[in-house]
């Protein structure tokens, strides 16, 4: 998790051809990109670095799905190395705010802020695939400037660290002391280890 907003562009399809799907209806054919079609099934993808533009899209999709049906689950699929703290926290707050349960799935990796978001899904509905990798650690700071300003930002990032660790303890069931210790450095967990830790509830080897 980082406080800096200087990142390479995430979640960008400029270099990737996004598949399209033709849906045949009595009113004619409609063409959807694959992500829009999955959104109709209440599936949201969170991939790449989490920054403001990515967070805004995910928040908007969750709010839209809530307005469509406040009773049906939202499914958030995660394959992300993490990203900006404030962007991630906007997603976190929305997960807690919307009425539908939010089921989280890790495929590939959930590191840093994305691991925190994986754990923040509805209890009992947090999953990962067998070869997924999860990594937790403390926030990263990259502020530059005058000594007084650096001290101000240091105090702020320590407050953020304490808040996130308290929330992580709440969602995993681990003690705050364990969370503080394990996030002091990069802590990598396999799918089974993440389940034992309380970051996910189940490792899926096949569809439920």
Curated annotation (Swiss-Prot):
<dbReference type="GO" id="GO:0006515">
    <property type="term" value="P:protein quality control for misfolded or incompletely synthesized proteins"/>
</dbReference>
<keyword id="KW-0378">Hydrolase</keyword>
<dbReference type="GO" id="GO:0004176">
    <property type="term" value="F:ATP-dependent peptidase activity"/>
</dbReference>
<dbReference type="Pfam" id="PF00574">
    <property type="entry name" value="CLP_protease"/>
</dbReference>
<dbReference type="InterPro" id="IPR033135">
    <property type="entry name" value="ClpP_His_AS"/>
</dbReference>
<keyword id="KW-0645">Protease</keyword>
<comment type="subunit">
    <text>Fourteen ClpP subunits assemble into 2 heptameric rings which stack back to back to give a disk-like structure with a central cavity, resembling the structure of eukaryotic proteasomes.</text>
</comment>
<dbReference type="InterPro" id="IPR023562">
    <property type="entry name" value="ClpP/TepA"/>
</dbReference>
<dbReference type="InterPro" id="IPR029045">
    <property type="entry name" value="ClpP/crotonase-like_dom_sf"/>
</dbReference>
<dbReference type="GO" id="GO:0005737">
    <property type="term" value="C:cytoplasm"/>
</dbReference>
<comment type="function">
    <text>Cleaves peptides in various proteins in a process that requires ATP hydrolysis. Has a chymotrypsin-like activity. Plays a major role in the degradation of misfolded proteins.</text>
</comment>
<dbReference type="GO" id="GO:0009368">
    <property type="term" value="C:endopeptidase Clp complex"/>
</dbReference>
<keyword id="KW-0963">Cytoplasm</keyword>
<feature type="active site">
    <location>
        <position position="137"/>
    </location>
</feature>
<dbReference type="InterPro" id="IPR001907">
    <property type="entry name" value="ClpP"/>
</dbReference>
<feature type="active site" description="Nucleophile">
    <location>
        <position position="112"/>
    </location>
</feature>
<dbReference type="GO" id="GO:0004252">
    <property type="term" value="F:serine-type endopeptidase activity"/>
</dbReference>
<dbReference type="GO" id="GO:0051117">
    <property type="term" value="F:ATPase binding"/>
</dbReference>
<protein>
    <recommendedName>
        <fullName>ATP-dependent Clp protease proteolytic subunit</fullName>
        <ecNumber>3.4.21.92</ecNumber>
    </recommendedName>
</protein>
<keyword id="KW-0720">Serine protease</keyword>
<comment type="similarity">
    <text>Belongs to the peptidase S14 family.</text>
</comment>
């Amino acid at each position: 998790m980082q406080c800096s907003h200087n990142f390479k562009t995430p979640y960008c399809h400029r270099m990737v051809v996004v598949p399209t799907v033709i849906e045949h209806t009595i009113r004619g054919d409609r063409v959807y990109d694959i992500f829009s079609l999955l959104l109709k099934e209440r599936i949201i993808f969170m991939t790449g670095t989490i920054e403001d533009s990515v967070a805004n899209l995910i928040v908007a999709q969750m709010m839209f799905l809530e307005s469509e049906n406040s009773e049906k689950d939202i499914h958030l699929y995660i394959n992300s190395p993490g990203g900006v703290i404030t962007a991630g926290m906007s997603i976190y707050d929305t997960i807690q705010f919307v009425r539908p349960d939010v089921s989280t799935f890790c495929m590939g990796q959930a590191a840093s802020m994305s691991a925190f978001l994986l754990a923040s899904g509805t209890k009992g509905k947090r999953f990962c695939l067998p070869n997924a990798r999860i990594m937790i650690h403390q926030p990263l700071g990259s502020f530059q400037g005058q000594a007084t300003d650096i001290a101000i930002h240091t105090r702020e990032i320590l407050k953020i660290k304490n808040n996130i660790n308290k929330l992580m303890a709440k969602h995993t069931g681990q003690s705050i002391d364990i969370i503080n210790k394990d996030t002091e450095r990069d802590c990598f967990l396999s799918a089974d280890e993440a389940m034992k830790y309380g970051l996910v509830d189940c490792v899926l080897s096949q569809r439920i």
